[in-house]
Amino acid sequence: MTAILERRESTSLWARFCEWITSTENRIYIGWFGVIMIPTLLTATSVFIIAFIAAPPVDIDGIREPVSGSLLYGNNIISGAVIPTSNAIGLHFYPIWEAASLDEWLYNGGPYQLIVCHFFIGICCYMGREWELSFRLGMRPWIAVAYSAPVAAATAVFIIYPIGQGSFSDGMPLGISGTFNFMIVFQAEHNILMHPFHMLGVAGVFGGSLFSAMHGSLVTSSLIRETTENESANAGYRFGQEEETYNIVAAHGYFGRLIFQYASFNNSRSLHFFLAAWPVIGIWFTALGLSTMAFNLNGLNFNQSVVDSNGRVLNTWADIINRANLGMEVMHERNAHNFPLDLAAFEAPSINA
């Protein structure tokens, strides 16, 4: 009896590392994008948790009036936030080593910039990792394309908007009430509700929710029962089964009669493309709108557009919105300026006789 021993070629440590990184047999795929994604998202998450709990007040407006955002400084889960980097820093890169001390770095809101920059890199790498895993498995790349919509939205509020406004202090605070404050101030300064791209985004999000609910309920209502009445219909599905799990003809017939025939998809692939494309395209448009408003290309302005024969203004809903915008604008950053920008923009009258 002859035993043949095959000599395994010795592979370098680097080659084995590369094979492990790109292996689709791992419980969680890492990938080359994951090599960057994991440390950046861990850093952003860790600093966010620490700052949300214990960060000292931040001089957000750069006028020596610190604003408290952490739990240990009097906030709760609703009011708490990681306060954006100070207006005194503007758009300057502000890592820890650029500050004279850790206290100064915290006072100027350094953690916000650290979190946002690492988070941005992390979510971009997550998108790349989705593409990378799809590529390794021989799948099409549309999962990463769909994820690009929330990435674009996050990029708009955390990166593009501060760049357009000239300071990271204008970025969205990392908290619940901070998010709402950002939305209110954004409406006051940019009239976002009257921007067509934001309207498309609203249609995308609400429409996507409606279509998702319609699709899920139709499928659930037209399952092909493989079980008795005494057990759940869900128990009749076997993972990887070749048979259809629901009757698309029945679903098509129901919806076609509920609305009209051509309102219902008879092609499952077209249907699922539509379900993905509708909210993604809507959110793309919203991100694009935010990015244009970052540079003060604002929503449509119909203020005082209706006048009578004597030239008197007849107020419309646009004028009511404008008055609300002015009220919100004078209330935010109360001590940083005395008047809203559009009231302070007029040239002062001459006092010379």
UniProtKB/Swiss-Prot annotation:
It is found in: Plastid, Chloroplast thylakoid membrane. GO terms for biological process: photosynthetic electron transport in photosystem II; response to herbicide. Chlorophyll a PD1 binds at H198. Its EC number is 1.10.3.9. A quinone binds at H215, S264, F265. Belongs to the reaction center PufL/M/PsbA/D family. Fe cation binds at H215, H272. Pheophytin a binds at Y126. Photosystem II (PSII) is a light-driven water:plastoquinone oxidoreductase that uses light energy to abstract electrons from H(2)O, generating O(2) and a proton gradient subsequently used for ATP formation. It consists of a core antenna complex that captures photons, and an electron transfer chain that converts photonic excitation into a charge separation. The D1/D2 (PsbA/PsbD) reaction center heterodimer binds P680, the primary electron donor of PSII as well as several subsequent electron acceptors. Keywords: Acetylation, Calcium, Chlorophyll, Chloroplast, Chromophore, Electron transport, Herbicide resistance, Iron, Magnesium, Manganese, Membrane, Metal-binding, Oxidoreductase, Phosphoprotein, Photosynthesis, Photosystem II, Plastid, Thylakoid, Transmembrane, Transmembrane helix, Transport. Chlorophyll a ChlzD1 binds at H118. This is Photosystem II protein D1.
